[in-house]
Amino acid sequence: MTVRKWLTVAAVAAGLGLGTALPAPAADTKGQFTFGSLRTLSPDAGKAKAEAWLKKAGKFDQAAFDKVWAQDEVSVLDRTLATFELGSAEAKKVLAAGTNSAVEAPKEVPEVLKDAKQDSYFRANLALGFARGLTNGRVYEESLATLQGVKAEDTVDPAAYFFHRAVAEHALIKRDDAVRSIVRLIDDVADAPDRYTMLGRIIFEDMANWKKDEKDLSNIRRLMDNSERRLAQARGGKTTQDIQKKIVFRLDELIKELEQQAKGGA
C-alpha cells in the first residue's frame, strides 16, 4: 500500500472528510506527478542550471560562482539561492525579507514572485526560498500564497516545497490542503528527507485529532493562536479582525448551545 492510500484510509477513519481520494486543488491540476516521480536536483544538474541562469542574467563571475558551488555541505537549494543573489539585486532583497520575517513580517508577496513572465526556474526557487524564510518566521499566510503561485516540479527541492506548504496549511487550519501536501511529500518525492517525512506524519496525526465541530474549544483555540500570532507581528488588519469575529461568533454559539443543554436538563 502506498503512503497515499494509507493516509487516505487513515484520514477517512479519523473523520477528516476527504472521501476515497485526494485530488489536488484546481490550481495544481497541471504537472501532477505520482508515486516517486519527483526528486531533489543533483548537485551537478543544479550547478549546470544555476550557471546557465547566471550567464543569461549577464552576471557570471567564475570565481564567485565556483566558490558557491564548492560548498558540498550546503544544499542544492541554498546554493541555487546564493547564485540568484550573485545575479539579481531583487532576489537578494526578496531573500533578505524572508530571512528577516520574524522581525518584520512581509504583508504581501513580492511582485517578482507573481510575475508569470519571469523564468519559471528563477521564480519557483526564489519563491521557495522566500516562503521557507516566512514559514520559519511564522508568517504563514504569505508563505502559502507564495508557494501556491509556483509548481513543485519547477523547484530544485520539491520535498522542501511540500513540507513548507504543509506547515503553513496546518498552521492556517487548512486541514484537507495540508493532508494533500503531506501525501505528495511522502508519496511523490522519492528522496524526501526523513526529517520532512517524520514531521509530515506528526502533522497528519495532529490533524487526525481535530474535532469537526467548529465550536469545539480546541478549534477556537487554534483561531486564537492565529489571532495572537498576527497581533504579535503587528498585523491587526482585516484578516485578523475576521479571525477575531469568528472567535466571538463561535464562543457565542457554544454558550447558547450549553445554555440550551442546561435548560433541557432542568
What are these regions (language model features)?
Residues 1-5:
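N-terminal secretory signal peptides that target proteins for export/translocation
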Residues 8-9, 169:
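General helical structural elements
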Residues 26-160, 164-266:
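Mature extracytoplasmic or organellar-lumen-exposed domains after removal of signal/transit peptides
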